[in-house]
Amino acid sequence: MSKVTEITHPLILHKLAFIRDKNTGSKDFRELVSEVSMLMAYEVTRNLPMEEIEIETPVCKTKCKVLAGKKVAIVPILRAGLGMVDGMLQLIPAAKVGHIGLYRDEETLQPVEYFCKLPQDIAERDIIVVDPMLATGGSATDAITLLKKRGAKQIRLMCLISSPEGIEFVQKAHPDVDIYVACIDEKLNDHGYIVPGLGDAGDRLFGTK
């Protein structure tokens, strides 16, 4: 079974409180989501493979550790996942960015794919799938399935807030994918929204309804 890591750093929890607040406007919401994503990226990348190289300082030659040959790709689930990309690129500027477009059918609550654009070397990269909310788990599960069909092998999932149901759903479908969240909330309501959650992340990011 995959590992679930709840990243409860004080700065993350502080910013998450304002992300949840319904009175936080789109501008501040976007900035906070980006900041929390950057902070979470530190933990999500903790186990990236490393290798030793030799460099020369102004004093002498020495050996240092750097990221190994495999590189990172960030794959946001559109559209809300876009809000997490810039923050992550602050820490991983060389990462490539793919895009998977899924929307949730309001009646069935199931994800529907409408767009997919990935780096050509996706099979050679460590993949971090990002989406602010892990609610039913359907979108994340479908995105991961799509990535595996394209050859991706090393995949992590990073979300700001999740429901217990969403985590369980992803774990059953993809027991090899580790999940990183800032907070695991209480439950899903009858409309498939996380409680207490933060509302619709995409609408709050982009000022739409």
Curated annotation (Swiss-Prot):
Keyword DNA repair annotated: no
Regulation: Allosterically activated by GTP.
Domain of life per record: Bacteria
Keyword match Manganese: no
Binding site for 5-phospho-alpha-D-ribose 1-diphosphate: R79, R104, D131, P132, M133, L134, A135, T136, G137, G138, S139, D200
PANTHER family: ADENINE PHOSPHORIBOSYLTRANSFERASE, URACIL PHOSPHORIBOSYLTRANSFERASE, CHLOROPLASTIC
Biological function: Catalyzes the conversion of uracil and 5-phospho-alpha-D-ribose 1-diphosphate (PRPP) to UMP and diphosphate.
Protein name: Uracil phosphoribosyltransferase
Species the sequence originates in: Clostridium perfringens (strain SM101 / Type A)
Gene that encodes it: upp
